[in-house]
């Protein structure tokens, strides 16, 4: 032990182990105390990191030194065999003795000379009958020092793993191998188990019907191997390992299935465990949300849970009215059943909404505004395939076009000019003002344009300290509408006053679009972006010049009695929200504008819908609708009684 560590290092190690120096050299005691102190000093257990590092370095150095000393002693002991030692007292023995001493360290040699003593006369010398103690015999190979190298390619080398598997191999002594073979077979009801001899040790290979951690198997075996060595490994290649252990230097001792393990006799679940139960696919939910652009957690959850109903029992699927619903229902039925039973329903839907927001953010950054508008029109065309079905629906939408024509004779030119404004998004030329008295059609037209392009309506009649979160709603939106902005009392004394116009005056950077502004939402970091363009609607309030100059165009609205009367007599346009829909505005453009005005990607859709509209209504019928609007009658009086 004196050759292992220096005196100072030995003292440090014993102090860290909290042992007296009298215990120095008691390796089993030091080993037990080392394991205890590892738990005490480990940083994850609240210990001292420096003490842990010092303890590990000293103890590992001690282990390495002890091993090297043992190896040196064995080499020294095995230099000479007993049969090679000559008879003591002969010249051969003197020569052997001189050669033997050359292997000793220099500090053990003595070069002193002793004074000669007078020789005593003696009778005849008798040959000595004594012999030197022969060196120790060379030890046989000890297979317990490490796991067989021949098997390393077939086993897992993970030190700490929570992975559960079904195939293991245990390496221990012959005596414990007999015990563990029976214990493991009884404990885990092994589907296959075999015992193999390896020099003076035993390897036990076994397959379990259920999955277990390697640590669980190891802990069970340790209960029967308190002194004997033990190696427990998970197996990555079961048949390859078994096949190798049936060849030299291994010997098959016994196995519970005659004939052993055959490569083709076992099913994959026998080797790798029971087939994994289907789990909820969050990605499939996210794909559904992306396809239908759903950004509401609870709406997504409610929509997806309904797919848990069997497709053959679904009313929508049985009617065959919506092919898209049937396709989506069949694709998502199994996953919806799993979602229905899941305890993380909201988490899965929240992640799906995050995917939708991320996709929207990516499109806003990478696509041009023209591409974004084209993509929006494509989405509306897909909705039209489901909604605008049958003569009644088409007539209702054509009635809405007739009503908008009564609102403004050049409504199509107005919409096209607005779309150009939104697409170009030029600084200081990004907003229109819709101004007029109550019930003059401002909000109706603004909402239809908002639904046509996609965006959000904002209320800025709130206190200024609440504005940041209201403006944060505009994150990643194509356009916005500042709805019903209130200001100071002007000519119309009956109008209520509010903070809207004053707040607009403080949002010049937002309206101009020259610089990026910071937008924020709750639980989301601020993000800088150009505030989206849009529309401001208000009644007849006074507008300061600093705000008025930021509107590219002001559209004045007036009350038209015939429009109100025709709506009252055609209530379906309001009850079914047809007037406010983006589909009505898109059909208006299809009805009035030539195909060449549309993007090439959607011109085929425009041609199709022009043909559909021509099949159901001609110019004469549409003129009749316009006449009914002008006279304040039911717009569909000729068609619906």
Curated annotation (Swiss-Prot):
<dbReference type="GO" id="GO:0005524">
    <property type="term" value="F:ATP binding"/>
</dbReference>
<keyword id="KW-0007">Acetylation</keyword>
<dbReference type="GO" id="GO:0016887">
    <property type="term" value="F:ATP hydrolysis activity"/>
</dbReference>
<feature type="domain" description="SF3 helicase">
    <location>
        <begin position="410"/>
        <end position="572"/>
    </location>
</feature>
<dbReference type="InterPro" id="IPR016392">
    <property type="entry name" value="Lg_T_Ag_polyomavir"/>
</dbReference>
<feature type="modified residue" description="N-acetylmethionine; by host">
    <location>
        <position position="1"/>
    </location>
</feature>
<keyword id="KW-0862">Zinc</keyword>
<keyword id="KW-1048">Host nucleus</keyword>
<comment type="function">
    <text>Isoform large T antigen is a key early protein essential for both driving viral replication and inducing cellular transformation. Plays a role in viral genome replication by driving entry of quiescent cells into the cell cycle and by autoregulating the synthesis of viral early mRNA. Displays highly oncogenic activities by corrupting the host cellular checkpoint mechanisms that guard cell division and the transcription, replication, and repair of DNA. Participates in the modulation of cellular gene expression preceeding viral DNA replication.</text>
</comment>
<keyword id="KW-1114">Inhibition of host interferon signaling pathway by virus</keyword>
<keyword id="KW-1096">Inhibition of host JAK1 by virus</keyword>
<keyword id="KW-0479">Metal-binding</keyword>
<dbReference type="InterPro" id="IPR001623">
    <property type="entry name" value="DnaJ_domain"/>
</dbReference>
<keyword id="KW-1078">G1/S host cell cycle checkpoint dysregulation by virus</keyword>
<dbReference type="GO" id="GO:0004386">
    <property type="term" value="F:helicase activity"/>
</dbReference>
<feature type="binding site">
    <location>
        <position position="329"/>
    </location>
    <ligand>
        <name>Zn(2+)</name>
    </ligand>
</feature>
<dbReference type="GO" id="GO:0039645">
    <property type="term" value="P:symbiont-mediated perturbation of host cell cycle G1/S transition checkpoint"/>
</dbReference>
<keyword id="KW-1121">Modulation of host cell cycle by virus</keyword>
<feature type="binding site">
    <location>
        <position position="325"/>
    </location>
    <ligand>
        <name>Zn(2+)</name>
    </ligand>
</feature>
<dbReference type="InterPro" id="IPR036869">
    <property type="entry name" value="J_dom_sf"/>
</dbReference>
<dbReference type="GO" id="GO:0003688">
    <property type="term" value="F:DNA replication origin binding"/>
</dbReference>
<feature type="domain" description="J">
    <location>
        <begin position="12"/>
        <end position="80"/>
    </location>
</feature>
<protein>
    <recommendedName>
        <fullName>Large T antigen</fullName>
        <ecNumber>5.6.2.4</ecNumber>
    </recommendedName>
</protein>
<keyword id="KW-0553">Oncogene</keyword>
<feature type="DNA-binding region" description="T-ag OBD">
    <location>
        <begin position="148"/>
        <end position="263"/>
    </location>
</feature>
<keyword id="KW-0413">Isomerase</keyword>
<comment type="subunit">
    <text>Forms homohexamers in the presence of ATP. Interacts with host HDAC1. Interacts (via LXCXE domain) with host RB1; the interaction induces the aberrant dissociation of RB1-E2F1 complex thereby disrupting RB1's activity. Interacts (via LXCXE domain) with host pRB-related proteins RBL1 and RBL2. Interacts (via C-terminus) with host TOP1 and POLA1 allowing DNA replication. Interacts with host TP53, inhibiting TP53 binding to DNA. Interacts with host preinitiation complex components TBP, TFIIA and TFIID to regulate transcription initiation.</text>
</comment>
<dbReference type="GO" id="GO:0039502">
    <property type="term" value="P:symbiont-mediated suppression of host type I interferon-mediated signaling pathway"/>
</dbReference>
<keyword id="KW-0238">DNA-binding</keyword>
<feature type="binding site">
    <location>
        <position position="317"/>
    </location>
    <ligand>
        <name>Zn(2+)</name>
    </ligand>
</feature>
<keyword id="KW-0899">Viral immunoevasion</keyword>
<dbReference type="InterPro" id="IPR037102">
    <property type="entry name" value="Znf_lg_T-Ag_D1_dom_sf"/>
</dbReference>
<dbReference type="GO" id="GO:0008270">
    <property type="term" value="F:zinc ion binding"/>
</dbReference>
<feature type="short sequence motif" description="Nuclear localization signal">
    <location>
        <begin position="134"/>
        <end position="141"/>
    </location>
</feature>
<feature type="binding site">
    <location>
        <position position="314"/>
    </location>
    <ligand>
        <name>Zn(2+)</name>
    </ligand>
</feature>
<dbReference type="GO" id="GO:0039576">
    <property type="term" value="P:symbiont-mediated suppression of host JAK-STAT cascade via inhibition of JAK1 activity"/>
</dbReference>
<feature type="modified residue" description="Phosphothreonine; by host">
    <location>
        <position position="133"/>
    </location>
</feature>
<dbReference type="InterPro" id="IPR027417">
    <property type="entry name" value="P-loop_NTPase"/>
</dbReference>
<keyword id="KW-0460">Magnesium</keyword>
<keyword id="KW-0235">DNA replication</keyword>
<dbReference type="Pfam" id="PF02217">
    <property type="entry name" value="T_Ag_DNA_bind"/>
</dbReference>
<dbReference type="InterPro" id="IPR017910">
    <property type="entry name" value="Znf_lg_T-Ag_D1-typ"/>
</dbReference>
């Amino acid at each position: 032990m004196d050759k292992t560590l220096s005196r100072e290092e030995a003292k440090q190690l014993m102090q860290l182990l909290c042992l007296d120096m009298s215990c120095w050299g008691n390796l089993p005691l030091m080993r037990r105390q080392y394991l205890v102190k590892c738990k005490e000093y480990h940083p994850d257990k609240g210990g001292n990191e420096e003490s842990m590092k010092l303890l590990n370095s000293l103890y590992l150095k001690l282990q390495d030194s002890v091993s090297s000393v043992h190896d040196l002693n064995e080499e020294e002991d095995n230099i000479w065999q007993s049969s090679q030692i000559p008879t003591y007292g002969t010249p051969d023995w003197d020569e052997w003795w001189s050669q033997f001493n050359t292997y000793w360290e220099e500090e053990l040699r003595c070069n002193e000379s002793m004074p000669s003593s007078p020789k005593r006369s003696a009778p005849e010398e008798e040959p000595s009958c004594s012999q030197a103690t022969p060196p120790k015999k060379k030890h046989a190979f000890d297979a317990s020092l490490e796991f067989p190298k021949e098997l390393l390619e077939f086993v897992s080398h993970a030190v700490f793993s929570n992975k559960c598997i079904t195939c293991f191999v245990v390496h221990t002594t012959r005596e414990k191998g007999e015990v563990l073979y029976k214990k493991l077979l009884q404990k885990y009801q092994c589907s296959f188990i075999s015992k193999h001899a390896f020099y003076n040790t035993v390897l036990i290979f076994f397959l379990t019907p259920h999955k277990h951690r390697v640590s669980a198997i190891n802990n069970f075996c340790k209960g029967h191997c308190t002194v004997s060595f033990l190696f427990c490994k998970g197996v990555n290649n079961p048949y390859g390992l078994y096949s190798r252990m049936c060849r030299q230097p291994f010997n098959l001792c016994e196995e519970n299935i005659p004939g052993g393990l055959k490569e083709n006799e076992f099913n994959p679940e026998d080797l790798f465990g029971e087939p994994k139960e289907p789990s909820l696919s969050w990605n499939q939910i996210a794909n559904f949300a992306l396809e239908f652009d759903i950004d509401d957690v609870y709406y997504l959850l409610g929509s997806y849970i309904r797919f848990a109903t069997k497709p053959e029992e679904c009313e929508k699927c049985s009617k065959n009215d919506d092919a898209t619903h049937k396709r989506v229902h069949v694709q998502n039925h199994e996953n919806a059943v799993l979602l229905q039973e899941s305890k993380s329903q909201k988490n899965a839907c929240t992640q799906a909404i995050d995917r939708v927001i991320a996709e929207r953010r990516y499109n806003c950054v990478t696509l041009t505004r023209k591409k974004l508008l084209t993509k929006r029109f494509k989405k509306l065309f897909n909705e039209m395939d489901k909604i605008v079905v049958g003569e009644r629906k088409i007539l209702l939408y054509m009635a809405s076009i007739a009503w908008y024509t009564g609102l403004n004779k050049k409504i199509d030119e107005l919409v096209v000019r607005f779309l150009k404004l939104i697409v170009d998004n030029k600084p200081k030329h990004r907003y229109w003002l819709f101004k007029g008295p109550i019930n003059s059609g401002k909000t109706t037209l603004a909402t239809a344009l908002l639904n046509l392009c996609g965006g959000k309506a904002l209320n800025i009649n709130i206190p200024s300290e609440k504005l940041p979160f209201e403006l944060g709603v505009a994150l990643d939106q194509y356009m916005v509408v500042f709805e019903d902005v209130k200001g100071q009392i002007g000519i119309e004394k009956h109008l209520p006053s509010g903070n809207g116009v004053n707040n607009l005056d403080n949002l010049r950077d937002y309206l101009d679009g020259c610089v990026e502004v910071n937008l924020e939402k709750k639980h989301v970091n601020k993000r800088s972006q150009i505030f989206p363009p849009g529309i401001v609607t208000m009644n007849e309030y006074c507008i300061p010049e600093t705000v008025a100059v930021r509107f590219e165009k002001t559209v004045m609205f007036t009350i038209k009695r015939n429009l109100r009367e025709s709506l009252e007599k055609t209530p379906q346009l309001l009850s079914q929200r047809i007037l406010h829909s983006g589909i009505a505005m898109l059909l208006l453009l299809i009805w009035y504008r030539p195909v060449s005005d549309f993007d090439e990607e959607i011109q085929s859709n425009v041609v199709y819908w022009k043909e559909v509209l021509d099949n159901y209504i001609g110019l004469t019928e549409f003129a009749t609708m316009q006449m009914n609007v002008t006279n304040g009658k039911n717009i569909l009086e000729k068609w619906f009684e």
